[in-house]
Amino acid sequence: MSSPYFCNHLCVVSVCNMPPNKKKGKGKKEPKKGAKKPAVRKPLTLKQKQRKESKVVRADSLNWKPVEIPDNLESYEGLYGIEELDGVDVKYVDGKAEFVVKEEKKDTKKEENENEDKNEIEDEDDEEEFTGFDDPVTETKRPSDEPDLKSKKKQKPNKDDELRENAFVGVDASLPKDTDLPKWSMENVSLSTYTINGLAGCGFKEPTAIQRKAIPLALQGKDVIGKATTGSGKTLAYGIPILERCLAQLESKTNTIKPPTAMIFAPTRELAHQVVDHMNKIAKFSPLAQNGIVSITGGLSIQKQERLLSHGPSILVATPGRCLELMEKSVDLVNRMALTDMIVLDEADRLLQDGHFEEFEKILDMLNKHRPKKTQGVSRRWQTLVFSATFSRDLFGKLSNNKPRNKESSFIENDEILSLLNTKLQFRDRTPAVIDANPKEIVSGKVTEALVECGPSERDLYLYYFLLMYPGSTLVFANAIDSVKRLVPFLTNLNIPTFSIHSSMIQKQRLRALERFKAAGEKNQTAVLIASDVAARGLDIPNIDHVAHYHLPRSADVYVHRSGRTARAGKEGVSVMFCSPQEASGPFRKLRKLVADSANKGSRMNMHSDVKLLPIEMDLVTQLKPRVNISSKLANSTISTVSTKKSDSWMKEAAEELGVDMEEEFVDDHLRKQRLRDDNKILTKDQAASLRAELKSLLNERLRINKRRSYLTSGVDNLAHQMLTGDSHEAVWGHAKVKALDQLKKGKSTKKSK
């Protein structure tokens, strides 16, 4: 059998007996008989090629590179001075190690291309020299003027190089007509035209209290600690100084990757993405590149984030976990981040809370170690900006804890804020500027707080009553993810558009839910977002009319941030709590003591002195009970079916991995009881179809207040008058359209009407 090399490279040509004059081309002399045929050269094998291209090198002449030890690994348990090699093979000959290095190939392609170009030019010259015919004389362009395709290809700019130069490009962005915002002209501060146009485009005609006080100090390079109620514009209070610093550092193009001008840290992914959106809106008219502001958060592709960081963005917005993960993978990235000018802590109390976000403390340590001590143009420490709505120690305590509270006020002075932060941070200034825009408020004065007293099993009923009577955009907070998952099908069955967001969802699902909820709010449609406390901090969702606390929050600071999701940007809103009698006697009373105004300090406060009871129409509540009961059964059946399928699949996978047969005898008693409870809640297809049909008929019936009325014109606010004027409630006959905020402001009787 022939070798495969011979099969591939040898070609046998048979020539038929044809006359010589009919053969194509010139005839070739046939080799004489008995002459030796030329030997066919066999191709080199892979091993032969490697031997030819490699050489043995002594160990001391190799290109050893020192290994940089990451900070998180400390000192490799005592090892130091480690070096590494790349592209070296080790061969053992007679027990001795030999280092084999590949020889560098000579780059002959360039020489070939140059020779080809020379030959082409010579051919062109030869053609031009021929002047045998008298053609009309025309002006001809010089060869240098003609476009050279090859040179064009060589001069084609690289996209990565353009992005790597700087986050800012040296061209002026197209600006709209001159805009004048005189109220943004603060003392000793003149904002750039780019920023002014960005503010005008977003509709911010005047600064808020925290912005008016913090921006001038931040632009002067001072450390700032800002405290203000939720929804007061803290993002722009540090965002505008950062953008102005970036514009001031605008330089010519360079090939080096520049360090970020500012690093902004946020406790949640959603808050980080929101900060990026706000910064991009303000920087819309500035010469900021497409990837000038980058978010570094978990739940998204880490490879894409590494690529964006390689282009040297000017502003980084990060969550501590993903930022630390990227820093541990690259020492070059740490060195670049350590040269930043500004570090911002948004929702700083959460970032620095004991037992939380240990990653952030590690990040600060790594940046401190790698920041150069004496470098021209780099100060010893970076500028630090700290912002939050809550800084009190008492606000973080659990409301269910019965330990005696400090007799001092829950409001803390500036000195105490400094002592709290100095233990965690190292400021550049000895005395950072502390700004308290709302010293006597924790919850914004634009938020009207309300209470609904109900039993633990009646939360669903009263929540549905509230959503039905007061349509609009509502954000419902629950303490448990299971409650979030159950409320979504419960309200969906009642024809209420409902979305959900919780920590078990992947990042893309969270962002999609937020986008849909925002879109519904922008169209003034009724929509509900059921959320865990992952959405409590920092999220700026426009046009939220109500915040409903399905469960009382576990700590006072969570209540403050939950309530701050409404009444933003100067608007008003409602925060309503659904409270059981057990909660009212303990956690609710403690919550009110912590959050109440300082005017009540030291006085014996009535539980309802600053929280109004929401008026309840008990006649309507009774009519809603059948709907709620059916919807609860359908929702429980859906949740139990999903839970049962998940547990079954998990048990099967575990049994297959162990190689055992899954039998009922080996199932744990607790799992068996849980399965029995779930099976009891699961409805058959016929039962579910019957209940859905019954619920549909109930939903098609419009509620009627005070059913004993027999005539359309009976009562002061009669039904006929409301139908003619169009003031009738969409879901309830005989009930006027009313908003929860207006209802609470009227100061109606707090007793439930019967």
UniProtKB/Swiss-Prot annotation:
This is ATP-dependent RNA helicase MAK5. Residues 215-409 form the Helicase ATP-binding domain. Residues 103-118, 138-150 have a biased composition (Basic and acidic residues). Pfam families: DEAD, Helicase_C. It is found in: Nucleus, Nucleolus. GO terms for cellular component: cytosol; nucleolus. Residues 17-61, 103-168 are annotated as: Disordered. It catalyses: ATP + H2O = ADP + phosphate + H(+). CDD domains: DEADc_DDX24, SF2_C_DEAD. Belongs to the DEAD box helicase family. DDX24/MAK5 subfamily. The Q motif is unique to and characteristic of the DEAD box family of RNA helicases and controls ATP binding and hydrolysis. Its EC number is 3.6.4.13. SMART domains: DEXDc, HELICc. Residues 119-132 have a biased composition (Acidic residues). Transmembrane segments: none annotated. ATP-binding RNA helicase involved in the biogenesis of 60S ribosomal subunits and is required for the normal formation of 25S and 5.8S rRNAs. Residues 460-619 form the Helicase C-terminal domain. The keyword ATP-binding applies. The gene is MAK5. A motif (DEAD box) lies at residues 346-349. The lineage of its organism: Eukaryota, Fungi, Dikarya, Ascomycota, Saccharomycotina. A motif (Q motif) lies at residues 184-212. ATP binds at A228, T229, T230, G231, S232, G233, K234, T235. GO terms for molecular function: ATP binding; ATP hydrolysis activity; RNA binding; RNA helicase activity. Keywords: ATP-binding, Helicase, Hydrolase, Nucleotide-binding, Nucleus, Ribosome biogenesis, RNA-binding, rRNA processing. GO terms for biological process: rRNA processing. Residues 21-40 have a biased composition (Basic residues). It comes from Meyerozyma guilliermondii (strain ATCC 6260 / CBS 566 / DSM 6381 / JCM 1539 / NBRC 10279 / NRRL Y-324) (Yeast).
